[in-house]
Amino acid sequence: MSDNFAAVGIALVVAIAINLIMMLMPKLLAPKKPVPEKLTPYEGGNQTIGRTWLGFKSNYFLYALVFTAFDVETVFLFPWALSFRQLGTFAFIEMFVFIVILLVGFWYAWKEGALEWM
């Protein structure tokens, strides 16, 4: 059993070492003198006037959050549905409560406008 852990540990150390090497190589091999052309903005080469960082409202995370909740529900529902006959009434009640909690959360998100676009 400890041989399996040793193999996982060695693989982890090798993966970390490869990542560190790949992150350090550009810093070691890149030219050190900054060229003025590389410091100019790309878009047309024009110097910007005023504030250049414009914030925008992104609601994708709300959709991702709701999707993740229902994706987790699917992960729990699939094995439960496959072994439904062996589990009995108690498992049915537990899964029913789980689905009700998720539906209440979905209803609340809908009511609060979390699913409205912009």
Curated annotation (Swiss-Prot):
EC id: 7.1.1.-
One of the record's GO cellular component terms: plasma membrane
Compartments it resides in: Cell membrane
Molecular function (Gene Ontology), one example: NADH:ubiquinone reductase (non-electrogenic) activity
Keywords linked to the UniProt accession: Cell membrane, Membrane, NAD, Quinone, Translocase, Transmembrane, Transmembrane helix, Transport
Topology within the bilayer: Multi-pass membrane protein
Entry protein name: NADH-quinone oxidoreductase subunit A
Organism: Desulfitobacterium hafniense (strain Y51)
Taxonomic path: Bacteria, Bacillati, Bacillota, Clostridia, Eubacteriales
Gene: nuoA
